[in-house]
Structures are given as C-alpha cells and as structure tokens.
Amino acid sequence: MSASRFIKCVTVGDGAVGKTCLLISYTSNTFPTDYVPTVFDNFSANVVVDGSTVNLGLWDTAGQEDYNRLRPLSYRGADVFILAFSLISKASYENIAKKWIPELRHYAPGVPIILVGTKLDLRDDKHFLADHPGAVPITTAQGEELRKLIGAPAYIECSSKTQQNVKAVFDAAIKVVLQPPKQKKKKREAQKSCSIL
C-alpha cells in the first residue's frame, strides 16, 4: 500500500465567523458552546475521499487584526484554503474580497480556495434575527456571486452546530487538490508560455 498524500488545509476568515467551530465539528462531531478565539490545535488524520486515502492536515488561523503579521506564517506550504464568512455577517462577507483575497493572493498565489458560508442554521432563525437586528443574512445567490468574483472552484454553506454540509466542505477541499479544475491548468499553461516568451 502506498503512502497517503499529505494535504495542508488552512482555514482563513474574519474573527468569530466559526472557523474553529467548523474544525472541531469536523474532527470530533461536537459543537463548542463557548466562544474562545482560536484554540484548535493543528490536526492530522487519514481521510478517504473517492477511494483515495489522504493525510489531511488542518491548520486554524486567527482572523483578528492583532494577528495580521503572524497569520501568514501558517500559509507556507498550504495546498488549499477554506475561506470562511458568516452567513449572518455582511461585514465578514465583504471582507472576503476586501481583505482576505488580497492577503491570500499575496502570500500564497495560485493555491485553491474553497469559499464557505458558516452559521447556516442561523440565517433563517427568526428568534436569532429578532435578537440581533444588525445581522444581515447573506443569500446563497450572493455566496455564488462572490465565488465567481474570487474565482473559487466551490462555494458551500454549512452549519457546524447541526453538522449540515461540514463533511462536504473538507471533501471539496481534498478534491480540489487531488483533481484540480481544468480551467486553472489552462490559465497556468498560458502563464507559463507567456513567461517563456
């Protein structure tokens, strides 16, 4: 049996959008009830996707501005990014294009990005929305529009609390590394041929 391929997957996004909860939900099937900024240790596990076994390494990052200089250190060697925003936070949605895409393109150009909308369970929760009048739900159409804008191969909405689509997020991250989209290859080949000239 051949050794499984190692895939480094790094979560990125604004503070409090649910990056750590997503990782904890995926790795332990539990949902933390208290918010403690980034207390997820790097995690590695063998995962089987479409019959291929990979060793998935999960790296959490802190979204807060205090970590702007430290955070990019975890980007080195990344195979894929999970770029998360909260489906109930317009600011976190807007920061994908304003802050995170420029940062990732600067420090890790060419690394694929899976766009993820978190807190799906709260988007249609009338009690939550009544208690949080500032919360502006982001629609699936808006998420898809953002995916196209940033050129991400996939957009997935999930809930770490209910576990809806949590596995799908990481399956998509693994698949984009194992089977890169053909469009990106063409772009790279075109770039290579241009740089040769």
From Swiss-Prot:
GO terms for biological process: small GTPase-mediated signal transduction. Pfam families: Ras. It comes from the Eukaryota. A lipid is attached at C194 (S-geranylgeranyl cysteine). Coiled coil: none annotated. The keyword tRNA processing does not apply. Residues 195-197 form a propeptide. Inactive GDP-bound Rho GTPases reside in the cytosol, are found in a complex with Rho GDP-dissociation inhibitors (Rho GDIs), and are released from the GDI protein in order to translocate to membranes upon activation. Belongs to the small GTPase superfamily. Rho family. This is Rac-like GTP-binding protein RAC1. The gene is RAC1.
